[in-house]
């Protein structure tokens, strides 16, 4: 038994490196099959402090193959990810401000709905007091398939205290709207190392942690996202160099976004 465990430990880094390289190559070579769609649009939403912007920065690090200067958090960003050759990958992340308790704080659920339908212009700054209207400059009256959201990603921090019921209700409302629009959905659970000492000690314990599994199960029940569509990730924060096991988790989630988005585009050609 001891020999078996030591063997698993010794081959784990090789497995992670191989899978990381495979997923990275897949993302790098992906191109939308439809000429009118230049990129896949991924909308990320969640509670305040969930780690949405940090994940986007982590994706930038992985695709560039080095640590990069992190982008500052804002009310919205439309960010095309770039690789080592200064070529842009066909991915755009829409990062909106976090959902908060109350009606006059955080982003409005109606604004997220407009974004999913493609009615929000890139770079528009959301107003927590007043939602976007057809008269606003940031409103796109005639969205193309390229403008619409192709994947909805709900982000939840594993280390967050209990999420307010009203925030969870907003999350469910956004999901229900996405379902009506046929937009595929998935979720990411961030800050997994801060939430579990076993994972903080060694990231390969991510799939062994009973604590994390319960967190994911509770989150699945609360917002209605299946367990097999919830991906644990660790964002880069205080590291100065890339790590294969961190990259692997980021790329696993990214690969699923590409697959889901590609499916949506193919189904909505007409």
Please give the residue ranges for each predicted region:
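Short hydrophobic segments within beta-strands
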Residues: 43-45, 94, 188
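Switch- and interface-adjacent substructures of P-loop NTPase systems
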Residues: 30-36, 59-183, 191-211, 234-239, ...
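N-terminal pre-Walker A segment at the start of P-loop NTPase domains
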Residues: 2-36
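C-terminal structured domain segments
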Residues: 210, 214-225, 237-240
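Glycine-rich phosphate-binding P-loop
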Residues: 40-64
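A structural motif corresponding to the C-terminal end of an alpha-helix
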Residues: 148, 181, 219-227
